[in-house]
C-alpha cells in the first residue's frame, strides 16, 4: 500500500512538473500552464497574426515576431515570404525559413506592396529552455548590404490595448505605456518617428502584474522599445533589435520569459444571448471551460425582481466535449416560459441579465441598422442626427474613368480596355448620387450595393418591413436621423442603392466594378467622408470608377435589381421598370456564358419572381443537373420559386437532394462545435458567413418546411447575439443587447467608437486554436462593418425568428 502511495505521488509530481515546463504539444506550439507560444502557425502579418506569438494566461499579448525592414512597419510595408517550417520534438524547437521579397505581393496582388531592391534569405528558430522561457535566434545566410544594417531588425509587436497605463523597465530606466504616441520627433530613414522609448539589454513589460509580466533579454544587439502608432494609427508597441553590419549566424539572440501564475486556469465563460429569448424558443446557454476542468454537475437560473435574485431552476449540466482549446457544456432552460429578466449561474460565475418575453425581437434589434448604420454609410449625402453631424456632403466629384491599373489597392484592377466610350481621366456623369460606403473604408462596390438592395427588398416582401424614422431628401442630398418623412426608410434606401447602380449603367452602358480613391493616402484616411475630396469634379483628388468583364458579378446584380423592381412597383413604377429592364438585359448578356450555374440559378429565381415568365421557369428546370451538383450553393434560391414549377420529376429530385443536404449539414454541425451551426473558425471572424447561412436556411425552410427545421437560422441569430466562443461574449451587432461591440472598425474607428446597427464578423481564430475578439478599433478581421449583408443579413434573421414565434395575424 505504501509503495502504491509513493508511486502515485511520483506520478502526480511528474504531471505537475510537466505543467510547469514549456514543451511542444501535438498542435505544434509550445505550452505550459498559463502560457502558449506559437510560431508561424498563422501567416497574416498585415493583420498582426504571424511569427512569434505569445498567449499569456489565455490572452494574446505579443505577435508578428519576425525580421522586418523598418522599425515601425505598417499594412503596406514589405513582409517576407515564408518557406519550410520544421518542428523538432527531440530538441524542443521550431525553425522557419524565410526570404525577401515576396514576389506574390511585390507590386501585385490584392494590396500591392512596393519592395526595395533587396534579396536575402534567413531562418528564425525558437527553442524552449526548460524553465518557462524560450529563445529566439535569427540566422542570416549572408550579411545584409551596409545600407540596410540598423534599418532591418527583428521586431516583436506588443498588443497596445492591454498595456495602456501599465509600466515598463529597461535596464535602469522606466516608463509608462501611454494612450497616445508623443514626441519628440526625429527623422528616421526619411520618415518622422518618435525614436525608441527606451534602449537596453533587458526589458520588463508590466512588472506590476503577475498575469502580464514579460521579460525580454538580448544576448546580441541592444533591445529597442518603439511606439508603432507614431506613423501608423493602427500600430502596436514594438520591441526590436537591429541587424548590425556583417551579422549572419546569431544576428539576433533573445530570451523571452513570460510570467505564469502557478495553478492558473481559464475562467468559465457563460455564453447566452445578449438580447434574450421568446418564451416558446429553445433556450440553451453554453459554458466554456479550461480543457482540464470537469463540468460542474448543475447550473442555476435566477429570475430578477424587487428582492433581487429568485432561484427558479437547478438543472443538470450536459458535457458537449472539446472544441478548439476549450471544453464545453450546455445549460438547457427551454422549459422556462414566464416573461421576465433572468441570469444563469455556473458555480460562482453569473451571466449578464437577459430577457424572456414575446416582444424580445420587436424593438432595439433590427431597427438600429435601418435607423443608424444604413444612413451613416450613405454616400453623396450629408447625414445629421439632431446636434450631431455623422458626415458632411461627400464625393460630389465622382468619378473619373480609371486609367489602366493592373494592381490598385483593395483588390481593384483596371484593364487596358475599359469597355466603355470613356477615356482614362474623363469625368463619368451620373456617379455623384446614391450608394453606401462599402465598409470601414469609403469605396463603392457594385456587389455590396446590389446585395444591400436585395436584402432590403426581401425583408419588405417576406416580413412587410415598413418603418419610417429618417428623413431622406435626395434633391438636397440630406439625411436627418430620427426625423420621419412619411416614407418607408427601406424603400428610400433601395432607391439610394439603385441610384448608383443604374446611374453607372446609364452612363457606362454596363455595370461599374467599383468607385475608389486614386491615392493610398486618401484610402487610409480616418475621418469625415467629406474630407477625402473637395467635391469639385475634374481635379486630382477625384475618385476613379473601375470597370470589368465579370459575368459572375453581373448575375449577382440581377438578383438585387429584380427584387427591387417588385417592391418599388407601386411606390416608384418608373424606377421599378428600369430596374427590371436592366436585370433582363444583364441576363441576356450572361445567360449563354458557360459555368456560373449557382449564380444563374439565383438570378433566374429572382427573375421568375418578378415576371413568372415561362422561359425563365423552363431555363431553371433545364438546369436540374447543375442545381443538383451545386445544391449547397444555390438550392436555397429554389425555395422561393418551387411553387411556380410544374415538373413533378424536377420537384421530386430537388426535394430528395435537399433532404440529403440538410441531413449532412446536421451531422457536420454536430461534429463541428456546440454552437448549433456549421462552424469552421478562420483568420476572419465567421459571423457574416453564419448570418448568410442562416438567411439561406430560412429560404430552404420556406420551400420545404417539412424537411428543413428552423433551428439553423435560430442558432445563427443566437451566435451573432453572444453565443459564440471566447471570453468576449458581446453581441456582434453594435448597440443590440446588454453587451455589444462598442469599439469597431467602422468609419469612426479612430475615435474608439461604433455605429449602432453595424454588425462585425466577430470572433476570429488565432491559429491553431485560440478564439479571439479583442477590444481594438483596428482589427478589420474581427470588428469591421460591411455593406452587402454584414448588417442586413442580421436584420433579416431577427425578422425571420420574430415571425416564427409571433406570426402575423
Predicted regions and their residues:
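Beta-strand-rich recognition/accessory modules
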Residues: 199-264, 801
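Extended, loop-rich substrate-binding clefts of extracytoplasmic carbohydrate-active enzymes
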Residues: 71-143
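Low-complexity, Pro/Ser/Thr- and charge-rich linker/hinge segments at domain boundaries
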Residues: 162-169, 263-282, 351-389
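Aromatic (Trp/Tyr) and acidic
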Residues: 190-211, 222, 275, 283-350, ...
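Beta-strand-rich N-terminal accessory domains
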Residues: 19-89, 188-193, 202
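Acidic, glycine-anchored loop motifs typical of Ca2+
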Residues: 476-493
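Acidic (Asp/Glu-rich), glycine- and aromatic
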Residues: 135-175, 348-360
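Sec-dependent N-terminal signal peptides
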Residues: 4-13
Amino acid at each position: 500500500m505504501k509503495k502504491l502511495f509513493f508511486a502515485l505521488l511520483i506520478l502526480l509530481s511528474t504531471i505537475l512538473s510537466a505543467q510547469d515546463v514549456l514543451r511542444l504539444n501535438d498542435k505544434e506550439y509550445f505550452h505550459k500552464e498559463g502560457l502558449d507560444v506559437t510560431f508561424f502557425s498563422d501567416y497574416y502579418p498585415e493583420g498582426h497574426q504571424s511569427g512569434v506569438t505569445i498567449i499569456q494566461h489565455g490572452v494574446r499579448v505579443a505577435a508578428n515576431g519576425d525580421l522586418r525592414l523598418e522599425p515601425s512597419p505598417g499594412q503596406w510595408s514589405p513582409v517576407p515570404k515564408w518557406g519550410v517550417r520544421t518542428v523538432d520534438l527531440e530538441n524542443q524547437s521550431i525553425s522557419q525559413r524565410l526570404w525577401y521579397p515576396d514576389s506574390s505581393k511585390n507590386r501585385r496582388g490584392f494590396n500591392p506592396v512596393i519592395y526595395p531592391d533587396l534579396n536575402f534569405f534567413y531562418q528564425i528558430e525558437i527553442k524552449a529552455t526548460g524553465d518557462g522561457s524560450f529563445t529566439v535566434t535569427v540566422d542570416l545566410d549572408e550579411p545584409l548590404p551596409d545600407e540596410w544594417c540598423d534599418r532591418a531588425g527583428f521586431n516583436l509587436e506588443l498588443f497596445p490595448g492591454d498595456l495602456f497605463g501599465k509600466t515598463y523597465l529597461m535596464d535602469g530606466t522606466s516608463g509608462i505605456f501611454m494612450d497616445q504616441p508623443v514626441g519628440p520627433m526625429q527623422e528616421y530613414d526619411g520618415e518622422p518617428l518618435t525614436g525608441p522609448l527606451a534602449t537596453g539589454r533587458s526589458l520588463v513589460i508590466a512588472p506590476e502584474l503577475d498575469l502580464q509580466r514579460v521579460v525580454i533579454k538580448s544576448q546580441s544587439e541592444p533591445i529597442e522599445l518603439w511606439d508603432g502608432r507614431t506613423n501608423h494609427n493602427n500600430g502596436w508597441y514594438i520591441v526590436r533589435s537591429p541587424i548590425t553590419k556583417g551579422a549572419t549566424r546569431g544576428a539576433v539572440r533573445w530570451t523571452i520569459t513570460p510570467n505564469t501564475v502557478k495553478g492558473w486556469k481559464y475562467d468559465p465563460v457563460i455564453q447566452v444571448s445578449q438580447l434574450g429569448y421568446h418564451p416558446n424558443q429553445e433556450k440553451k446557454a453554453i459554458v466554456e471551460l479550461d480543457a482540464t476542468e470537469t463540468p460542474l454537475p448543475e447550473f442555476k437560473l435566477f429570475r430578477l425582481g424587487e428582492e433581487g435574485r429568485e432561484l427558479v431552476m437547478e438543472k443538470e449540466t450536459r458535457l458537449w466535449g472539446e472544441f478548439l482549446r476549450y471544453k464545453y457544456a450546455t445549460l438547457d432552460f427551454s422549459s422556462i416560459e414566464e416573461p421576465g429578466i433572468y441570469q444563469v449561474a455556473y458555480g460562482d460565475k453569473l451571466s449578464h441579465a437577459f430577457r424572456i418575453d414575446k416582444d424580445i425581437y420587436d424593438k432595439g434589434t433590427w431597427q438600429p441598422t435601418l435607423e443608424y448604420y444604413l444612413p451613416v454609410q450613405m454616400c453623396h449625402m450629408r447625414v445629421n442626427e439632431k446636434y450631431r453631424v455623422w458626415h458632411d456632403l461627400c464625393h460630389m466629384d465622382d468619378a473619373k474613368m480609371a486609367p489602366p491599373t493592373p494592381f490598385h489597392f483593395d483588390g481593384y484592377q483596371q484593364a487596358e480596355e475599359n469597355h466603355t466610350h470613356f477615356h482614362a481621366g474623363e469625368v463619368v456623369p451620373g456617379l455623384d448620387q446614391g450608394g453606401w460606403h462599402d465598409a470601414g473604408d469609403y469605396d463603392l462596390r457594385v456587389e455590396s450595393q446590389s446585395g444591400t438592395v436585395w436584402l432590403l427588398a426581401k425583408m419588405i416582401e417576406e416580413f412587410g418591413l415598413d418603418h419610417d424614422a429618417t428623413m431622406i431628401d435626395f434633391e438636397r442630398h440630406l439625411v436627418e436621423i430620427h426625423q420621419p418623412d412619411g416614407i418607408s426608410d427601406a424603400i428610400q434606401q433601395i432607391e439610394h442603392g439603385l441610384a448608383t447602380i443604374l446611374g453607372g449603367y446609364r452612363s457606362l452602358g454596363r455595370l461599374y466594378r467599383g468607385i475608389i480613391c486614386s491615392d493610398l493616402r486618401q484610402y487610409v484616411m480616418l475621418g469625415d467622408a467629406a474630407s477625402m475630396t473637395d467635391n469639385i469634379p475634374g481635379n486630382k483628388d477625384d475618385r476613379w470608377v473601375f470597370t470589368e468583364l465579370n459575368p459572375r458579378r453581373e448575375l449577382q446584380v440581377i438578383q438585387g435589381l429584380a427584387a427591387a423592381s417588385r417592391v418599388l412597383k407601386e411606390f416608384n413604377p418608373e424606377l421599378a421598370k428600369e430596374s427590371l429592364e436592366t436585370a433582363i438585359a444583364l441576363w441576356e448578356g450572361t445567360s449563354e456564358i458557360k459555368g456560373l450555374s449557382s449564380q444563374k440559378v439565383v438570378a433566374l429565381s429572382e427573375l421568375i419572381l418578378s415576371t413568372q415568365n415561362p422561359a425563365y421557369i423552363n431555363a431553371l428546370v433545364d438546369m436540374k443537373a447543375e442545381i443538383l451538383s451545386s445544391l449547397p450553393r444555390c438550392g436555397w434560391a429554389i425555395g422561393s420559386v418551387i411553387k411556380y414549377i410544374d415538373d413533378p420529376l424536377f420537384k421530386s429530385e430537388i426535394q430528395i437532394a435537399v433532404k440529403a443536404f440538410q441531413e449532412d449539414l446536421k451531422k457536420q454541425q454536430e461534429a463541428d462545435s456546440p454552437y448549433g451551426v456549421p462552424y469552421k473558425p478562420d483568420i476572419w471572424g465567421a459571423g457574416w458567413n453564419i448570418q448568410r447561412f442562416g438567411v439561406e436556411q430560412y429560404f430552404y425552410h420556406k420551400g420545404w418546411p417539412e424537411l428543413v427545421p428552423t433551428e439553423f437560422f435560430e442558432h445563427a441569430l443566437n451566435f451573432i447575439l453572444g453565443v459564440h466562443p471566447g471570453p468576449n461574449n458581446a453581441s456582434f451587432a453594435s448597440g443590440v443587447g446588454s453587451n455589444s461591440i462598442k469599439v469597431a472598425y467602422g468609419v469612426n474607428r479612430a475615435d474608439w467608437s461604433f455605429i449602432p446597427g453595424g454588425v462585425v464578423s466577430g470572433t476570429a481564430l488565432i491559429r491553431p486554436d485560440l478564439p479571439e475578439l479583442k477590444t481594438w478599433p483596428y482589427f478589420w478581421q474581427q470588428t469591421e462593418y460591411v455593406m452587402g449583408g454584414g448588417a442586413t443579413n442580421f436584420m433579416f434573421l431577427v425578422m425571420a425568428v420574430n415571425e416564427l414565434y409571433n406570426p402575423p395575424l
